[in-house]
Amino acid sequence: MTHSNDSMTRRGLLGQALGVAALASAFNSAGQLIAQTPEAARIRDSFDFGWKFFKGDAPGAQQPGFADTNWRNLDLPHDWSVEGPFATTEPSGGSGGFAPTGIGWYRKHFRLPASYKDRKVSIELDGVYQNSEVWINGQYLGKRPFGYISFAYDLTPHLNAGGDNVVAVKVDNSLQPASRWYSGSGIYRHTWLVAVNPVHVAHWGTFVTTPRVSKEAAGVRVQTRVRNERAAAATCTLTSAIVDGDGKVVQTADISQEIGPNAEYEFEQQIAVEKPSLWSVATPYMYKLRSTVRVGQQTVDEYETPFGIREALFDADRGFLLNGEHVKLNGVCLHHDAGSVGSAVPERVWERRFEILRDM
């Protein structure tokens, strides 16, 4: 089975923490950095707190000096459609729950220490519905059509080191009817601020597969994309460590490669795990791939990818086999909202849904 870091970043389901190192800093409700450890190889912070929101269009709201004092204060995730008012005259129609849609704006003020100036700083958005556009300090970063995929933007060239920074997000769900189900509106999933060194594992840069699986041994294939954003070539050493559920390193592999300036290289490693604990529905055992990148003796990045070791096979005569055992697949009609909470669904709701599916 395959495991990319992308699929694990979106909700952090069932408590699988995606952070590479411990969260090295945090933002308070006012968007101020309240702690920092600049020596960390990688920093990944929740960016959910201290946002301002306006329901409706607000021309010029992308500019850092725009007056947002009277905007509503809130934390993410957020779905404005579920807040109503609901009316049969809403263009979303019956399939959209007669919910209000339209345009909404989000703004967040934040400050970073001057020590971040040598890092690449990105914003990651796990889901915005829909047709979002993002600015940093008045500079346009891009548009994400539709609204279910996660995406990221590089903030680095436009940041004010040590000064005030403003992220603005315009969400446009005004083209209605647009769905055969309730979609919600807004930044309905988590947001993150990520700071890395110039040499680092690329965004969603790991891909883990388990092409050979048995109770005696498993072959783990690891593909890792490392970027060098320095102006000179760098000889990089990648250490891939497989860590079990108790935090014990069960196997490691090292590989080195010179990567040219402003270039990217994909490493490939084959790692054997003896007597693996197999992932199954009854016992969903998880390992972690810990990727450490060094240039010389300096650790420049650390990155973790959760994965399970299992074999999945579809057979015309025996049906679906998981680790060689027949498993009956049950399906349900499930959309991404959760009733009265709309599309900004708490993780525990998703966990409970999976528990019900497991017990069917």
Show where each model-derived region lies.
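Intrinsically disordered, low-complexity Pro/Gly/Ser/Thr-rich segments with frequent PxxP/GP/PP motifs
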Residues: 252-275
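Short glycine/proline/serine/threonine-rich loop/turn segments at secondary-structure transition edges
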Residues: 118-119, 159-164, 274-286
